[in-house]
Amino acid sequence: MKIIFAGTPEFAAVALAALHAAGFEIPLVLTQPDRPAGRGMQLHASAVKQFALAHDIPVAQPVSLRLDGKYPEVAAEAHALLKATPHDVMVVAAYGLILPQSILDIPPRGCINIHASLLPRWRGAAPIHRAIESGDAETGVTIMQMELGLDTGPMLAMQRLPITADDTTASLHDKLATLGGEMIVQTLRRMEQGDLPAEPQPDGANYAAKILKEEATLDFTQPAEQLARKIRAFNPFPGAAATCDGTLIKFWHAQAVPASNQLPPGQVIAANPHDGVLVACGDGALRVTELQKPGGKRLSAVEFLKGFTLEDKRFQ
């Protein structure tokens, strides 16, 4: 079976690597254009492009696939390339570009998507973040047949994965990426054998909106449990944060703990090597165990307090 693969970040690169290791022929990879990154803002290839080039797989990087969009000539070239490349199916994982119907219609066996949630829950851009932030007990991966709607297509496979109390978006991402790679290989093997029934998604969809940097600010009037989930959900991006004496401090790890104090939300209850950093919340308190100030490294609470005083301070 010949596969065109479309994806961009590390999540997609794991799936591409799994397909390559399983022996599937991959005549073409689509990925987003190189983007400026790092302090020097130099152009960097996506994780998918890096894997493809390392394994001599041809790469195309159209800026758009919409014939009626801003770059119709680029889109037309991409359409022509797909039609000229012999393949059976397209596998899509976190590609980042909208696939119009004219693209979905090209692969003889359609387009199959790897989505990091238990559809129809958490359709959209940030399913891993939102699952942790909302306190879901589990998530998983859904393999679906793509159609024009956003993550609305019939399901071909689904596997569940528990969300542990210390999972961050980073750790859960890695687990789901590995699971997605395993599942797409299994799904395509079943497709080769002609055994791939599709199941319509049930009702009850909700949407995982894109993460905005503005969401990163912690509101200490909220319950500690809610804030602890947010800190885990926003690790590594964009990093939950609060301001103390005009300095923006990022919170990377924290646990909710009971607290009977009457201190105002955001007030530092304790900040010492024995107790760590304890911050009053609307309900309970946060025990913060890893912090970072601007331009600095992530530090344990003990190390952080050696260079920054929080005793009797209040976070805003």
Curated annotation (Swiss-Prot):
InterPro entries: Fmt (IPR005794), Formyl_trans_C (IPR005793), Formyl_trans_C_sf (IPR037022), Formyl_transf_N (IPR002376), Formyl_transf_N_sf (IPR036477), Formyl_transferase-like_C_sf (IPR011034), Met-tRNA-FMT_C (IPR044135), Met-tRNA-FMT_N (IPR041711). This is Methionyl-tRNA formyltransferase. It comes from Janthinobacterium sp. (strain Marseille) (Minibacterium massiliensis). The gene is fmt. It catalyses: L-methionyl-tRNA(fMet) + (6R)-10-formyltetrahydrofolate = N-formyl-L-methionyl-tRNA(fMet) + (6S)-5,6,7,8-tetrahydrofolate + H(+). One of its GO terms (molecular function) is methionyl-tRNA formyltransferase activity. (6S)-5,6,7,8-tetrahydrofolate binds at S117, L118, L119, P120. It is an enzyme of class 2 (transferase). The keyword Protein biosynthesis applies. Disulfide bonds: none annotated.
